[in-house]
From Swiss-Prot:
Membrane topology category: Multi-pass membrane protein
BP GO terms, sorted: proton motive force-driven ATP synthesis; proton transmembrane transport
Transmembrane regions listed in the UniProt entry: 12-32, 68-88, 97-117, 138-158, 164-184, 189-209
Pfam families: ATP-synt_A (PF00119)
Family of the protein in this entry: Belongs to the ATPase A chain family.
Name of the gene encoding the protein in the UniProt record: MT-ATP6
Record's subcellular location: Mitochondrion inner membrane
Assembly mode: Component of the ATP synthase complex composed at least of ATP5F1A/subunit alpha, ATP5F1B/subunit beta, ATP5MC1/subunit c (homooctomer), MT-ATP6/subunit a, MT-ATP8/subunit 8, ATP5ME/subunit e, ATP5MF/subunit f, ATP5MG/subunit g, ATP5MK/subunit k, ATP5MJ/subunit j, ATP5F1C/subunit gamma, ATP5F1D/subunit delta, ATP5F1E/subunit epsilon, ATP5PF/subunit F6, ATP5PB/subunit b, ATP5PD/subunit d, ATP5PO/subunit OSCP.
Catalytic reactions of this protein: H(+)(in) = H(+)(out)
Record's protein name: ATP synthase F(0) complex subunit a
Coiled-coil features, chain-numbered ranges: none
Record-level GO cellular component terms: mitochondrial inner membrane; proton-transporting ATP synthase complex
Keywords linked to the UniProt accession: ATP synthesis, CF(0), Hydrogen ion transport, Ion transport, Membrane, Mitochondrion, Mitochondrion inner membrane, Transmembrane, Transmembrane helix, Transport
Length: 226
């Protein structure tokens, strides 16, 4: 089908409604509230998952590190919600953009490093030189450790971008193959449709796991500097 110059700017619709409205209305469903004294199963399960995740990340932190609990909880919920919303048709996943992931990773990483330099500067600087290093290797190891320190936010952002983008590309390719095979070979279409369904389930798991991994690594950086 031929497209004009303004096709990329056309607002996508679902059942006659702008997709943006549906995307905006979806996040409140992830944080339901109950008017009853006793919460229902959905809210109870959600609160249990948040407490479990927070416990896993905060169990090794001291008092200063635990002040980040609200920040880390908000971060994992934001990334998980963004990844899951990107799996909907006619939607866009911001976490596939390296610029956005860098915008999240660099300030968080810089905050942990600044916290370490403020409260325990000697220990933080000591990480640049492993104990027992031979004297001739000291300059080289300091340079290597410094480079590895500055690569941490880049690794955070690239890991999230690559995993989310790869999954979306696979879903797009298999989905296109399913539509192509629909008029050619019905049994093969059923096979590709089954693969697409399994891949979608896998991508839901990847969306949640990548949110947890990103937040957990930030938590580990915080633990090293608090």
């Amino acid at each position: 089908m031929n497209e004009d110059l303004f096709t990329p700017f056309t607002t996508p619709t679902v059942l006659g409604l702008p997709a943006a409205i549906l995307v905006i209305l979806f996040p409140p469903l992830l944080v339901p509230t109950s008017k009853h004294f006793i919460n229902n199963r959905l809210i109870t399960t959600q609160q249990w998952l948040i407490r479990l995740t927070l416990k896993q990340m905060m169990i090794t932190h001291n008092t200063k590190g635990r002040t980040w609990s609200l920040m880390l909880t908000s971060l994992i919920i934001f990334i998980a919600s963004t990844n899951l919303l990107g799996l909907f048709p006619y939607s866009f996943t911001p976490t596939t953009q390296l610029s956005m992931n860098l915008a999240m990773a660099i300030p968080l990483w810089a905050s942990t490093v600044a916290m370490g330099l403020r409260f325990k500067a000697k220990i933080s600087l000591a990480h640049l030189l492993p104990q027992g290093t031979p004297t001739p290797l000291i300059p080289m190891l300091i340079i290597i450790e410094t480079i590895s320190l500055f690569i941490q936010p880049l690794a955070l952002a690239v890991r999230l971008t690559a995993n989310i983008t790869a999954g979306h590309l696979l879903m797009h390719l298999i989905g296109s193959a399913t539509l192509t095979m629909l008029t050619i070979n019905l049994p093969l279409t059923l096979i590709t449709l089954t693969i697409l369904t399994l891949l979608t389930i896998l991508e839901i798991a990847v969306a949640l796991i990548q949110a947890y991994v990103f937040t957990l690594l930030v938590s580990l950086y915080l633990h090293d500097n608090s």
